[in-house]
Amino acid sequence: MLDENEIKENLKSLDGWVLRNSILYKKFSFKTFMNAFSFMNIIADHSEKIDHHPKLINGYNVVEIELYTHSSNSITKKDFLLAEFIDNIYEEIFSQ
C-alpha cells in the first residue's frame, strides 16, 4: 500500500496517468477498433499472468483504463508496474 505522497511521486514517472477518485486512470486512442481491442487483449493476457486485473473500458477506438488493487483497497506498486507495462506496449505497438 502506498501513501498519498508515494502515489504522487510515482505518478511523476508516468505520462498521462492521473489520480481520479483514488484510482489510476488513463485514456488511450487508436486508429481502429481492432487496434484498441488488440491492445486490451495484450493487457488481459499479461494481467492473467501477474494476477492483477485492470478495469478496461472500450468505446470504438478508445480504451480507458483504471488501476486499483482490490485486495488492499488502495493503489499499490503493482498498479504502477502494470501502468508502465501498458504504456510500453502502447508506445511499442500502437502509438504510430
Regions inferred by a protein language model and the residue ranges of each:
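C-terminal structural segments of small proteins and small subunits
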Residues: 67-92
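Helix N-cap motif at beta-to-alpha junctions
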Residues: 32-33, 72
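Short, well-ordered beta-strand elements within core beta-sheets of diverse protein domains
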Residues: 23-31
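Solvent-exposed alpha-helix faces
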Residues: 41-44, 84
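Short acidic N-proximal helix/loop "leader" segments that mark the beginning
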Residues: 1-19
